[in-house]
Amino acid sequence: MGARSESLVGVVLLFQLLADRLWCAATASDSLYDVSYSITAIKPRVDEMVSVDTHMYSHRWKRQSVDTNRPSVGQDFPDMFLEGTNENGTEIEEDTDHKYYTSRTYGPLDSASRDLWVNIDQMEKEKVKIHGILSNTHRQAARVNLSFDFPFYGHFLREITVATGGFIYTGEVVHRMLTATQYIAPLMANFDPSVSRNSTVRYFDNGTALVVQWDHVHLRDNYSLGSFTFQATLINDGRIVFGYKDIPVPVMQISSTNHPVKVGLSDAFVVVHKIQQIPNVRRRTIFEYHRVELEMTKITSFSAVEMLPLATCLQFNSCSSCVSSMIGFNCSWCNIPQRCSSGFDRHRQDWVENGCTEESKDTVCDDLLQTTGISHHTTTGLHATTSIYAFTTTTRMASHFPSNLPTEDDTKIALHLKDNGASTDNSAAEMKTGTLHTGLIIGILILVLLIITAILVAVYMYHHPTSSASLFLIERRPSRWPAMKFRRGSGHPAYAEVEPIGEKEGFIVSEQC
């Protein structure tokens, strides 16, 4: 019994090794450009595969020196700012991204740098929360609920994820590769709060703004550089402020070997598609559609960066206001989701599935007017009109996925969406596909059971060579079959079976990920 149990354990370990090898192969590509973070205090994770595809779309930057009458963060946090900075004002360098944000960088001599820094030490101590786990771990992230709606790239957030690596993750799909996209990064680097007793990660929410501060944190791979103190402030009007108090070395000198080094913003949309071979399992692919990269040479002690949100299509709630908008986007209105969009936001999959890429912004509003006129034309034909409208809606739903998409990016995304594109008219095909999936699973299970049975029989014969079952199989091995004997004597060359003089030791080398 002892030998048999050891054999079973060996079989289990063999399958575990194969599973680990497959997992390593699946995640190897992600590890090339990202690092893994552990998530604490979140909802149970859904067992789904997540991959990150960092597609970048070109955007222009404009640099100029300007004066500003921007509202100060002091309106949200009065009398709680860093003291001792120089009051002399200098020119403000404005980097204008003509898409989603305008960034303004203030040097250590700018008075605005003092105004934008929130002195968290002067706040009510009972309202300042020091996160115990983040302050004592490495590569850890935790969910934080907001008391207000925070607009990020036009989307309203009520929950964020604060990471020890100097950034905030803003995505709804929580995965381990948080540094890839969907982040707010005042200074993303390989910080480890656990290496020093003075290192903390704390935050404060006063109902209109959230301040997250990384206080006296050190780099894990270069502790001798000194401690960093910086913060990110998220304001309910969409403004984002990065404040820097202690930056002991130029940011360009921070190593990115073990962790990405980034300063800026990023957002992405998620495409969910099914896997044909495995039912009830979905795969999420994350596409980055925009990124703001700030100049790292401008990040110094007592400097600050303010990012002002620009108008987006998502803020328009009607067809007329959408198509007549004069902003930096080509806004279009889609009837089915009742949404205004440029086509690239977090609702991208819904936009493509509903055929919104085919709708013209010049004719959509006219269609809405015609539909309204039909509904008020007569009351006697109410039932007939309702039936026609339902039929039209069903037809539209059946053709949600466009047959001819205008751009290469749309085509690539559509290929992912086809896995989800089963319409209401294809119920029979769905049942057939479900039957095929069931048969495939049963076949795989039978094959696995046969392989396990063969392995167990071989192990049993090895440990019990004199048993009746072993002798029975040995006497009926293929070399004893009549056909094999006839072939051996038919003039065809054959190899003779010989017993080895001495046994050779074999070994298996297993590599870990």
UniProtKB/Swiss-Prot annotation:
Topology class, membrane: Single-pass type I membrane protein
KW Acetylation (keyword) present: no
Highest taxon above the source species: Eukaryota
Spans traversing the lipid bilayer: 439-459
Domain PSI: 312-357
SMART domains: PSI
InterPro entries in UniProt: Plexin_repeat (IPR002165), PLXDC (IPR031152), PSI (IPR016201)
Glycosylated residues in this chain: 88, 145, 198, 206, 222, 330
Spans within the Cytoplasmic topological domain: 460-513
Compartment annotation: Membrane
Signal peptide span: 1-24
Family: Belongs to the plexin family.
Stated name of the protein: Plexin domain-containing protein 2
Source taxonomy: Eukaryota, Metazoa, Chordata, Craniata, Vertebrata
Name of the gene this protein is made from: plxdc2
